[in-house]
Design a protein with these regions (language model features):
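GIY-YIG nuclease catalytic motif and its immediate N-terminal context
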Residues: 1-66, 70-73, 104-112
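Short secondary-structure boundary/capping segments
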Residues: 16, 85-86
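A short, exposed loop/beta-hairpin motif centered on an aromatic-Gly-Thr core
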Residues: 59-62, 92-102
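Residue-level signal for well-ordered alpha-helical positions
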Residues: 74-78
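Charge-biased low-complexity segments
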Residues: 86-92
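Coupling/hinge elements of helicase-like and P-loop NTPase modules
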Residues: 117-129
């Protein structure tokens, strides 16, 4: 499975939100079977979270967006604003969307939601900026 836009956003929409609203989002990622090789080809060193990334059963990337669909399209196309993890991992699906009133609110919520997910899903590596 991979990210399919805008269809993957539709289950999270309601009467008060549109695809272009600000939000915090969580993407399920899949690591390549040769993660170390792929990583070493793209980057000069491995991050301090390397062991967590490798040992976790699942990987989730949490991000904030001023315009949700635009940011997800950036992730999907990888033409602009690449992230480290999506440069080496494939996006499997959009796991969740938390709508926010604006980008400032989304940035504040991103950290809180990341920590909540880390605490709630011990077998998952949760990455945010």
């Amino acid at each position: 499975m991979s990210l399919s836009l805008p269809e993957d956003i539709e289950p999270f929409l309601d009467d008060t939100h549109t695809w272009t609203d600000s939000a915090v989002y969580a993407l399920c990622l899949s690591r390549p079977h040769n993660l170390a090789e792929v990583w070493d080809t793209k980057f000069d060193h491995r991050p301090d979270y390397w062991d967590e990334l490798v040992e976790a059963a699942n990987v989730v990337y949490v991000g904030a967006a001023k315009n949700l669909i635009s940011r997800l399209e950036d992730h999907h196309s990888q033409d602009v604003r690449k992230t480290v993890l999506t440069a080496v991992c494939d996006i499997e699906s959009l796991r969740n969307v938390w709508w926010c009133s604006d980008m400032d609110h989304a940035i504040q919520e991103e950290s809180k939601l990341s920590i909540m997910m880390q605490n709630q899903y011990a077998d998952t590596y949760v990455h945010s900026r």
